[in-house]
Amino acid sequence: MEQWRYIVTEAMSPAMNMAVDEAILQLHSEGKVPPTVRFYTWDPATLSIGYFQKAIKEINLEEVQNRGLGFVRRATGGRAVLHDQELTYSVIVSEDHPKMPSSVTEAYKIISLGLLHGFQNLGLSAEMVSLASEEEKEKYNSPGSSACFDSPSWYELVVEGKKVAGSAQTRQKGVILQHGSILLDMDVDLLFSLLHFPSERVKQRMIDSFRQKAVTINEVSSRPISLQESIEAFSKGFASGLEVELTPSTLTDEELALAEELVRTRYATDEWNLRR
């Protein structure tokens, strides 16, 4: 069976987390590292925004700072994500890998099978819903909110009809980077306090809609699920979903050096994080 690399990194700063994902992508494109599945957490808890979001217009940056949270713009699309009581994953693999369909949506589906298996390993009755129809898209979408779990992807992972994972994908240098957030618990009021709304009424409507369409692992689990148990469940999930053997590893010195350079030149700069 084909071997992919499997890495669990210690909690890192928001800039470093995004820089590491990009460093793996770049060095994988150069053939220096194998396809990689990575799990990580954030220190401090962080609000990340999508590549195309307007930071100053959409985000209450003063509140982010007052709460002692980190802030970073991702290289992937999507909306705002609060990385707090959650596990973040990333999958980095060449576009031309035999397991990866050329279609963006189908590649997203293949990678997301790992998530599906992970939720099932935790004893949750998760399912993958195709959002091909406008009716399905509407069911999982909340127009007007900048929060990621309000926005539908092409395939949605749901438990009891509610979204349980938010993912985004980018393709650069012939490599796919898909990363996303697996929620263990969530402070919905905190998330929405970090976003701008035209009025309190609109904000409350978005919160109510969000609660109807998104859910966390520990809200639907019959027992408490820890971070470590989640890592084990999802690592097995990606191995079975992708039909590969995951070999535990660590970041190379070259990856770390490149990531530190990307922190300095991109992910820790206002030019990157506050643009648009």
UniProtKB/Swiss-Prot annotation:
Enumerate the UniProt keywords alphabetically. Acyltransferase, Transferase
Q: Which reaction does it catalyse?
A: octanoyl-[ACP] + L-lysyl-[protein] = N(6)-octanoyl-L-lysyl-[protein] + holo-[ACP] + H(+)
InterPro entries named in the record: aa-tRNA-synth_II/BPL/LPL, BPL_LPL_catalytic, LipM, Octanoyltrans_LipM/LipL
| PANTHER family in the record | OCTANOYL-[GCVH]:PROTEIN N-OCTANOYLTRANSFERASE, OCTANOYLTRANSFERASE LIPM-RELATED
Query: What's the source species for this entry?
Result: Brevibacillus brevis (strain 47 / JCM 6285 / NBRC 100599)
Q: Where is the BPL/LPL catalytic domain?
A: 31-246
Q: Which GO terms fall under biological process for this protein?
A: lipoate biosynthetic process; protein modification process
Quaternary structure (record): Monomer.
Question: Gene3D superfamilies attached here?
Answer: Bira Bifunctional Protein, Domain 2 (3.30.930.10)
Q: Which domain of life is it from?
A: Bacteria
Key word Transport present in the record?
A: no
Please give the Pfam families that the UniProt record associates with this protein: LplA-B_cat
Q: Which residues form the active site?
A: C148 (acyl-thioester intermediate)
Q: Which family does it belong to?
A: Belongs to the octanoyltransferase LipM family.
Protein name, per record: Octanoyltransferase LipM
Role noted for this protein: Catalyzes the transfer of endogenously produced octanoic acid from octanoyl-acyl-carrier-protein onto the lipoyl domain of GcvH, an intermediate carrier during protein lipoylation.
Annotated site location: Lowers pKa of active site Cys: K163
Q: Could you tell me the EC number(s) of this protein?
A: 2.3.1.181
The UniProt record lists the keyword Signal: no
| Record-level Gene Ontology MF annotations | lipoyl(octanoyl) transferase activity
Further comment found in the protein's record: In the reaction, the free carboxyl group of octanoic acid is attached via an amide linkage to the epsilon-amino group of a specific lysine residue of lipoyl domains of lipoate-dependent enzymes. The reaction proceeds via an octanoyl-thioester enzyme intermediate.
